[in-house]
Amino acid sequence: MGYPEVERREPLPAAAPRERGSQGCGCRGAPARAGEGNSCRLFLGFFGLSLALHLLTLCCYLELRSELRRERGTESRLGGPGAPGTSGTLSSPGSLDPVGPITRHLGQPSFQQQPLEPGEDPLPPDSQDRHQMALLNFFFPDEKAYSEEESRRVRRNKRSKSGEGADGPVKNKKKGKKAGPPGPNGPPGPPGPPGPQGPPGIPGIPGIPGTTVMGPPGPPGPPGPQGPPGLQGPSGAADKTGTRENQPAVVHLQGQGSAIQVKNDLSGGVLNDWSRITMNPKVFKLHPRSGELEVLVDGTYFIYSQVEVYYINFTDFASYEVVVDEKPFLQCTRSIETGKTNYNTCYTAGVCLLKARQKIAVKMVHADISINMSKHTTFFGAIRLGEAPAS
């Protein structure tokens, strides 16, 4: 917005409507008419419109003046007091005179002013200027002192620049206004709304699977404090079973009187046709089908066995083994005597350290013999002597 826009604004039509309104309402002694009330309302409407136009003109003028002040300050900072732009802009006293455009248009009658009606007396120019200045001071009392000071400053500038040529102001006017310096940054705005949720990310690389190897055991902790002694329990009855357990446990098995051919009647050569004569069930357990004797308690055991054999098919000797978990522990071998009968017995015994769940059995070595399972000549047993010695 520049200075030429001020010259193109229309003059303020304030005095003419006032005089017409006063004549229409008969305030100057005219005879009353029938439509006097309507004329008063019409006058008030025109008066309000005129007042609104006044206010609009004043607002535009104040905006123009502030723009010119900013432009002048920028040019003075950039080029100093003798810059061409400053002298050209301020060479005309009416460019920054806050009252100049208004009083010039109001003081000189223009062709846009409405003609006076017959019987109206025009107000003198001085009274019109004073009337407009009074309105300006009434609505903007703070601008009065600044307007007078600005007018005096423009006049001094005009006198100091009067020696310049006539082409200088015209050239400066054609340049136009320059851009002012950037203002300070404004306060940050409010945060915006949250954006939409983004797509899911790429799954990460799976980690290295851990190992199930147990680490080395840590050092033993310090011993805890000794607890208080417990309460004395009630006196118990004498345990008779303890004395029985301290006694030697015995098992004795006998044949049932049958005759057995090893090749046809025995599976794997193990004798299984036993009858129990005596057995401690807490220490021994017999498996009838397999013929094995299981030990239930660790300890030192005396194992014994005897078998009556009958030689057949020109066999001149017989042999059997006492096995522990199918491993040979004792072995007995007997040959036939010349001129004797084919029956003969073979006895063997020994001491062995056994652990719980170990099994004892009698196994024949040769298959071409027959066994006489008589209860007096064929038997098998074991005696627990005591606990195993400490290693």
Swiss-Prot record:
Membrane topology: Single-pass type II membrane protein
Ranges in the topological domain labelled Extracellular: 63-391
Free-text function comment from the UniProt entry: Cytokine which is involved in epithelial-mesenchymal signaling during morphogenesis of ectodermal organs. Functions as a ligand activating the DEATH-domain containing receptors EDAR and EDA2R. Isoform TAA binds only to the receptor EDAR, while isoform TA-A2 binds exclusively to the receptor EDA2R. May also play a role in cell adhesion. Isoform TAA binds only to the receptor EDAR, while isoform TA-A2 binds exclusively to the receptor EDA2R.
Oligomer status and interactors: Homotrimer. The homotrimers may then dimerize and form higher-order oligomers.
SUPFAM superfamilies (alphabetical): TNF-like
CDD domains associated with the record: TNF (cd00184)
Pfam families: TNF
Protein name as catalogued: Ectodysplasin-A
Transmembrane segments: 42-62
GO annotation (BP), single: salivary gland cavitation
Alphabetized InterPro entries for the sequence: TNF_dom, TNF_Ligand_Superfamily, Tumour_necrosis_fac-like_dom
Positions of the UniProt region annotated as Disordered: 1-28, 72-129, 146-244
